[in-house]
Amino acid sequence: MLERSGAMLWGRTTYEMMRGYWPAVARGEIDAADAERDWAIKLDAIPKYVVSSSRTEYPWANSHRLDGDLRTAVQDLKAATPEGVLLGSVTLAAELDRLDLIDEYLFLVHPRIAGHGPTLFESGLPRTRRLDLISAQPMSNGVCVMHYRRAD
């Protein structure tokens, strides 16, 4: 997924959570499997854009604040990133869906059942969203990657 994307887009909370772990993995400061370290190095190199009204500093390599009107800023980012923008933030995903700014969805289903925490589209959507399945791929770690395109 990361190899096929030109940028990451996160909300502040997701950025802070990711920044607290992955740069240290990339630098070899945290023991991790080779596949995790490789992913961390790729994540370190890719441009990362953050939507935040409160955070002003972005010390992680290649991290930038996405400024201005959300719709316009995301449209501009998508236009400037032909490889695609990979979104990873529950709250931001719901807002971008409401603004009709998500073209495709990659859902990663992990072999775990969480008893708490945020859920995708927790606050709902204005209408049912029809999707067309592009692919479904099981990974060696038990995760299933499901790729959908908007049908409407």
Question: What positions do the PLM features span?
Answer:
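Enzymes that bind and transform nitrogen-containing heteroaromatic metabolites
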Residues: 1-152
